[in-house]
Amino acid sequence: MTAKVLKRKLALRIKRKRRIRGKISGVATTPRVSIFKSNRTIYVQAIDDVTATTIAAADGRKLGIKANKEGAAILAKEFASVLKAKKIDTAVFDRNGYLYHGVIAAFADALRENGIKL
């Protein structure tokens, strides 16, 4: 892809991200689960927007996983155990402007399978 096309795709993702963030918010009991996907790995964190603090976080680099569906499922299982340890069973999913497809959908489905309500 050319640089112009990549710039446009990023601009559209940021536009979607801002639109989504205007509609959702997380609190301490139901935090916002924000996901970031790079070409190599996945990062996820649970955020309390009222106090602007990160409640829990998981990093694909520490687990040695790749940014694919299988890696997303492994990361979701690990992240669900961290949330359960902090007695959180409900969250609001922030797909961060990414389309709900592939890795993002696999992560959300695996998080639900591990007992976190989204």
UniProtKB/Swiss-Prot annotation:
Subunit structure and binding partners: Part of the 50S ribosomal subunit; part of the 5S rRNA/L5/L18/L25 subcomplex. Contacts the 5S and 23S rRNAs.
Family: Belongs to the universal ribosomal protein uL18 family.
One GO CC term on file: cytosolic large ribosomal subunit
Record function comment: This is one of the proteins that bind and probably mediate the attachment of the 5S RNA into the large ribosomal subunit, where it forms part of the central protuberance.
GO molecular function, one term: 5S rRNA binding
Swiss-Prot/TrEMBL GO biological process terms: translation
Annotated NCBIfam families: L18_bact
Entry keywords, A to Z: Ribonucleoprotein, Ribosomal protein, RNA-binding, rRNA-binding
Keyword Ribosomal protein: yes
Protein name as it appears in the record: Large ribosomal subunit protein uL18
Gene3D superfamilies registered for this protein in UniProt: 3.30.420.100
A Pfam family the protein falls into: Ribosomal_L18p
InterPro entries noted in UniProt: Ribosomal_uL18_bac-type (IPR004389), Ribosomal_uL18_bac/euk (IPR005484)
Keyword RNA-binding applies: yes
Xref: PANTHER family: 39S RIBOSOMAL PROTEIN L18, MITOCHONDRIAL, LARGE RIBOSOMAL SUBUNIT PROTEIN UL18M
